[in-house]
């Protein structure tokens, strides 16, 4: 007998989180009832897809109570390295709450092992939920707190994994690259597709990140899908990586540098592709002050230099400019740049991203250099911004002007390959 609607609350609301069987167009469907605001059923099928049905198509409720998964008891395995996983948000090791439809963090070590049991074959997991925020809400204060937690974790773990939303993961990776000198791997990882979707990259990325966290690496890296298939992940230096696509699973790319390594899946075999800081090569050190009054300005045709005057009048000490081509702005900017450079640090980067800034080719570029602007070499604009925040937080203006030209964490390659 088909159930009837219960009072003013729709039947779909009453059955949220329950497993039901529905008949539609001569076929039988089973799944979990998801939230719906239309009065119809939205069913999460076992294959991960959501399908909508009318209430009258319901045949029966299969479970009265929501399914409660059994969480395995974790036993520390001798011979495996201890790895700390710090969550800041994102979709890695998260689950769908079938009552609300939201993806929620499930972040005890037992919950992670339940979702990605293969992790226990790679390392002993110790998990900590530091934040559960969207990555666009990350602020410099969060970077500092995160760096301090990682610094502490590195003292008694062989590596650290940081799960992070993908939109600003490259900002956070760059920030920790400058604030932390690390003798062990610090691996950022995220997911482009939420863990309830059949195309989710969450589990594979996490397994590859765990492998990276146990390898011969001594720096901050990002580990994400290397292609749109589930065949390998790439390990990118934290100061040379950028998210270059809104939704593709291989959105993260190394810019002006090769990836550090490739981790094949499911074998988890590692191939090193370029130079890297090795495990134990550097001493553990934390330098965590950041100057907030640094700004990134994207030049476009017709943009007035008044924007420089505005920030300068507000006490800003650092300016990163995304110029055109080789690193140019309008000649109208030259006089303002000269005044700003007297007591501030101004770094020129390129909107092109790939390639190297060179302001010695055209007259405008030479005028920019004579005004006191510093070429940003092959640094990404976001990396130059964070580097300048770090330098001005820990050094004088004159020291920062000299140090910004030098590679601190591998952010400047000695040559550019064409």
Curated annotation (Swiss-Prot):
Catalytically driven reaction(s): L-glutamyl-tRNA(Gln) + L-glutamine + ATP + H2O = L-glutaminyl-tRNA(Gln) + L-glutamate + ADP + phosphate + H(+)
Keyword Glycoprotein among record annotations: no
GO molecular function, one term: glutaminyl-tRNA synthase (glutamine-hydrolyzing) activity
Keywords: ATP-binding, Ligase, Nucleotide-binding, Protein biosynthesis
Active site, per annotation: 91, 166-167, 243
InterPro entries assigned: AsnA_fam (IPR006033), Asp/glu_Ase-like_sf (IPR036152), Asparaginase/glutaminase-like (IPR006034), Asparaginase/glutaminase_AS1 (IPR020827), Asparaginase/glutaminase_AS2 (IPR027475), Asparaginase_C (IPR040919), GatD (IPR011878), GatD_N (IPR040918)
Residue intervals of the Asparaginase/glutaminase domain: 81-407
Enzyme class (EC, first level): ligase
Origin: domain of life: Archaea
Pfam families for this protein: Asparaginase, Asparaginase_C, GatD_N
Record GO biological process: amino acid metabolic process; regulation of translational fidelity; translation
The enzyme's E.C. designation: 6.3.5.-
Task of the protein: Allows the formation of correctly charged Gln-tRNA(Gln) through the transamidation of misacylated Glu-tRNA(Gln) in organisms which lack glutaminyl-tRNA synthetase. The reaction takes place in the presence of glutamine and ATP through an activated gamma-phospho-Glu-tRNA(Gln). The GatDE system is specific for glutamate and does not act on aspartate.
Self-association state and partner proteins as the record states: Heterodimer of GatD and GatE.
Protein family: Belongs to the asparaginase 1 family. GatD subfamily.
Name assigned to this protein: Glutamyl-tRNA(Gln) amidotransferase subunit D
UniProt source species: Archaeoglobus fulgidus (strain ATCC 49558 / DSM 4304 / JCM 9628 / NBRC 100126 / VC-16)
Organism placement in taxonomy: Archaea, Methanobacteriati, Methanobacteriota, Archaeoglobi, Archaeoglobales
Name of the gene this protein is made from: gatD
